[in-house]
Amino acid sequence: MQVIKEELKPFINSKPKNRELPLESVKIHDNFLTDQYVKHLQSIFFNQSFPWCYSPFVGYNFQDTKISKEERDNHLYLIHKIYDNLRPIEDSFQTFDQFLPILEALEVRSLVRIRALLYVNQTVLIKHETHQDAPYPIKAALLYLNDSNGYTGFEDGTKVDSVCNRLALFDGSIPHHSTTCTDAKERLVININCF
C-alpha cells in the first residue's frame, strides 16, 4: 500500500519494524515524527474550533461494573473519531488524510479505527477502568501529542509515560488503562487500531 507522496516522507523520523501479532511487549519509539509534523498535528487537535465529543466513561460502559457514582463522575474524556467502521468519519476526511504517512510507516494492512482522545486535567491523577481495544489480537498504536504526568498502564505493571512524539505499539487485546494528568491542562493521545 503506497500512499505516501515523496513530499510527505520527511514527516516520519523512525519507522517501526513490521511485527506480526501478537506483540509480546510494549515497544516504544521516541521522536517518531518530525517536530514540524508534531506541531502540525497539535495545531489541528488543540484548535479551539476542533469538534470534540463528550464521553461520560473511559473504556467500558460503567453500568456493568462496581465503580461508585463518585468515581464514575470523574471517568470522562473527550473523543474525536477519525476512522471507524471501515471508513473515515464524514466530518473527518481532511483529518484522516493527515494520518496517511503514519499509517504507511506502521505498515497498516487493514485499518480498524483512529481516535483522538483528550483527557482533561481534574486536579488529581485518575486511573481509568482497565479495558481492551478488542477481545482478539490487534495492533494498537498510541501516539502522545503532548507532555504530561499521565500514562498508559498495563496489568504487568508496565507504564508508558505521556511524552510528546512518543509512539507505543502493543497488542490491543492486552488489558490496559489510561489516566488523566495534573501537570498540564490536558493529555492528548491518538489511538490507532489495525492489522
Please identify what each model-predicted range represents.
Residues Q2-R109:
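Non-heme Fe(II)/2-oxoglutarate
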Residues E104-T123:
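A short glycine-rich, His/Asp/Glu-containing loop-to-beta-strand
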Residues L118-V120, L145, C194:
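Short beta-strand segments enriched in hydrophobic/aromatic residues
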Residues L125-E129, Y136, Y144-V163:
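A short beta-strand-loop-beta hairpin characteristic of the jelly-roll/cupin
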Residues E129-T130, P175-D183:
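Short beta-strand His + acidic residue motifs that chelate non-heme Fe in jelly-roll/DSBH
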Residues A141-L143, A184-F195:
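A short hydrophobic beta-strand segment most commonly corresponding to one strand
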Residues V160-H176:
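Conserved metal-binding segment of the jelly-roll/cupin
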